[in-house]
Each structure stands twice: as structure tokens, then as C-alpha cells.
Amino acid sequence: MDNYIQFPRYSIYLIPNKLFINQVEKLLLKNNVKYDNLEISQYGLHYTVKAPFYLSHLYNEEELINSFQEYFLSNQNKSYKEVFNVLGLKKIKNVFALEMNSNEKFNFLCNDIMRYFDLYRKTLNQQEVQKDIKRFSNLTSLEMEYYLIWGYPYLFEFSNHHISVSDIKKEIIFDNSIKSLNYSNISLMRQDSINSKFISISKSD
């Protein structure tokens, strides 16, 4: 069911380097899964820093891009460039995900980005909220509170450092072949329609 309010949608993702992407694809092929055939492939392999959002009518895309570029030119916290250890594979809701270690500096950066760019997120009216929230199910009272404040329920204590690699339709056996993760860049992404992939429209290496 199409419960989206409008397109395009925007998001901010940390994008793994090519080595990590190749390792994930090889892992999935060992389990007879092709990443490009999965529904989640429209998002690409990534860690979500700012979940997909609708752009406020108060701003345009050019202003969003300029703000994104200025933020990373002035921010000296480059903790996303560190090497992160892969802790294992786990089920998170309806996906299999590789979980990574984290640290306070990295968590602070991600939360700061999420809050900073919330300025550009469209505030939904009551009718739009009733439609949009159908994308989520069985929210706790605190998850609901986060959704109403930030437009996304799985934040802070309900989130951890992970990259979704497959759905749960087929069991994935992890052979510990992926030891670490380096991010290639942090990207401002755009999705133009319900079936289109998220594409990068600006990035910081």
C-alpha cells in the first residue's frame, strides 16, 4: 500500500566503501540471495543518519543541498571516517543486518545531523500523519512520541549502528567473512517515486 505523502523524499545516509559492498554481495550469493532482487535494494547498502523525509514547503532542494554542504565544511567531527568492527549478523524487525561497534563521538555526530536537518522536514497535518504512520506497526508509546517529534520512530535507544543486508524471507548464514567497515562518504539522497532507487544528490567524503 502506498502510504507516502509526496515525492521526492530525501534522506541522509552513510555509504559503505566498495570493499564492504562487494563482501556483502558475496555473502548473500553464498546464501543464494541476489541483493539487487531484494526490495530493500532501492535504498542501497547504507547506515541511516536521517530517515527518509518530505521536504518542507518553506525550503527548496537547492537550499537543502547548500545547507548540507555547509554543515560538513564547518563540522570538524569526522568520526564516520573511522574503521568500525563488524560484530555479527542479527535480525532487526523485518531484515537481516550487520551490526557494527560505535562510540560517543560517532553517535553524537549522527544525532546532531538528524536534529539539524529536521528543520527541512515537512510538518504533517493530522490527516497526513494518519496516512504516513501506516508505514509502521506496533509502535510503543515512546516510539510514537519520537515519530510525532522527529518523523521517524526508531531513534536513540531504539536504534543501533547497523546496515541492513537482506530481508528475512530466507535465512542468512553469516560466516564471519566481513570483519570491518569503512564508509566511503555521507550522502544526501533523493527518491523520485515509490519504485525508484535513492540517489545521491550531494556528498561529503
List the model feature ranges, each with a label.
Residues 1-84, 88-90, 105-205:
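Basic, often amphipathic N-terminal segments
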Residues 12-14, 96-100:
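Generic recognition of long tandem-repeat/solenoid scaffolds
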Residues 92-94:
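Short acidic/glycine-enriched loop/turn segments that link adjacent beta-strands
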